[in-house]
Design a protein with these regions (language model features):
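Membrane-water interface of transmembrane alpha-helices
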Residues: 57-77
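Alpha-helical transmembrane segments and their immediate juxtamembrane interface regions
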Residues: 2-10, 24, 121-160
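Short membrane-interface loop/juxtamembrane segments of multi-pass integral membrane proteins
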Residues: 78-96
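Lipid-exposed faces of alpha-helical membrane segments in multi-pass integral membrane proteins
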Residues: 13, 50-53, 57, 102, ...
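Long, highly hydrophobic alpha-helical transmembrane signal-anchor segments
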Residues: 1-57, 130-137
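Membrane-interface elements of multi-pass transporters and channels
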Residues: 28, 32, 67-68, 119-124, ...
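Alpha-helical transmembrane segments and their membrane-interface junctions
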Residues: 19-23, 45, 98-121
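Membrane-water interface at transmembrane helix exits
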Residues: 23-26, 61-65, 113, 153-157
Length: 160
């Protein structure tokens, strides 16, 4: 169960950071360094910097977790989908069905919200960035909801 929770929490963090980094890429942090004959200027969103750091650190943390857990070679690639026995295979199937239902529901609702955001933006705001942020937020929220529902269902089924 630890492997599913670890992977799901990592995925949720990844999707949240990715969503925030891509929702607000236009809020740059400007910094610079100069030396004799050398100049460096950085224009980067702080959220994008956190996302990039997470992309570097998460695989390292995952490798350490896999090594310390003593998982088999067959389960290293897909921790949340790996099954050690028939019971875990059935649990994974039920959790995947739940995640699929949540994913489809969120996508249908998200399309409606996106259409409403497009209409409101075109009618009242005239701001294309608001529609972009809404779309990225919907995609990130959908991925978070699917990952969280998979983890919750998997843990509930495992404890039965």
């Amino acid at each position: 169960m630890k492997k599913v929770v670890f992977e799901s929490v990592g995925n949720v963090l990844l999707f949240v950071l990715m969503g925030l980094a891509f929702m607000f890429p236009f809020s740059p942090y400007e910094g610079g360094a100069t030396a004799d004959g050398f100049s460096l200027s950085v224009h980067l969103s702080p959220l994008m910097a956190v996302f990039v750091v997470f992309l570097v650190l998460y695989p390292i943390a995952r490798a350490v977790f896999v090594r310390r857990s003593g998982l088999h070679a067959s389960t290293r690639d897909n921790l949340e989908l790996a099954a050690d026995d028939e019971r875990e295979l059935q649990i994974t199937g039920r959790a995947l069905r739940t995640a699929y239902r949540v994913l489809m529901t969120c996508l249908i609702v998200g399309l409606g919200v996106l259409a409403a955001a497009q209409f409101l933006s075109a009618t009242f705001l005239g701001d294309a960035v608001a529609v972009y942020r809404t779309a990225v937020g919907i995609i990130a929220a959908t991925l978070v909801a699917a990952s969280a529902s998979y983890c919750i269902r998997w843990c509930l089924e495992y404890r039965k």
